[in-house]
Each structure stands twice: as C-alpha cells, then as structure tokens.
C-alpha cells in the first residue's frame, strides 16, 4: 500500500505520512470526542540542510526545525516544538556558526502571526534567517505544510503554512517543500515553519489571555480588537 510499500520501492521522509495519519485520526474523532483531540499543527519533520565545498573538504549541515502545535479544548498549542515523532533537539546558534563558517544566523525566534486564533490559540512556528557567506553552497530540504495550512477545530482558525524563501538582491525566490537549491554568497535563506490551528471561536477567548498575548508579542492591538473582539484601551483604562 501507499503507507506500507513493499521492497524494492524507494522510501524517504516516513515521518511526514505518519503525521498525516495522526491528523486524520484527530479529525475523525473530533465530532465524538471533542475534549480529547487537538487541532492540526506543523506536524511535520522540517529537515533542512546545507552543503558547502571548501578548498579541502565538503561540509554537511542538517537540522530538524520545529513549529507550532495545535490547540485543544483546555490549552493553547505549544510554541516552536518538534513534531511528536521527530525527537530532535535544538542546536545552539553559536555552535552552528563555529562548526559551519560559511553561514551566519541573523534571526532566530518565534514567527509572529503564525498561530491560529481561537478560544485557545495554536502554537507559534519558527522564523530563522541564515546569511550565506560564500559561494559553493546549496540548500536541501524535505518538509510539509507549505500548501495546506494546519486546520483549526470548532471555529478555531488555521495556523499559517510553512514557507522557505531565498532573498537574493532585490528578488525573493520561493523554495519548494522538497528541494535541492543552489545558494550564492550574500543570499538570505528564510525558514518559516507553520503555526498550530486554534480551538474554539476566537471571540470566546478570555480577554485576560488576549492581553497577555499582546504583552508577549503574540498579537497586535489591531488583531486583539478585530479577531478577538478585545478593546485594549478599554481594558487598560
């Protein structure tokens, strides 16, 4: 079958279809077990890598970057966490730059605007930006959630889909979710992973939670008013 192929079929990235099976189960159980399910999240193995040919060696970098988890009936989704079956740790930026001098990490943090709104909001995805410091480098990836956004449940809004970009001069190039993409000195490689879907209608969110999100930079005052129906000035006044 598609999910259990027989030899000698070539296979790769098995974690991604495993995550989609999990999503299907959650969606199927939602109508009968609403208290036990989660909205969709990034739910994928965002395997990103770069290769670089120096004068005396070939350097290979690979890392799995997390994203936002979906919300549930009692809690917001977790921020910037790997998929349940990825089991990968976060590599410190300083270690990356020491080990791979052909690149520099210019930004690394939560991706603003990626979380799906809801009574309980989804988790935030990741935004990471690499500056490429030399030619002879390439970007390689297999990922998912670039076309179909993580869905929300029971009125919750979807999270933002993932996207990989290369900023080259005044041009912005979109990199597919599975790709081998040549890089040039001066390129900015932008990795933005998906946020989680929300659970429940946004207008049912506790205003105190909306104000907390505003203070933490998860939402703007305009989003608090337009999406959640919370007038920040009135609550502060």
Question: PLM ranges: what are they?
Answer:
Residues 1-237:
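Glycine/proline-enriched, intrinsically flexible loops and inter-domain linkers
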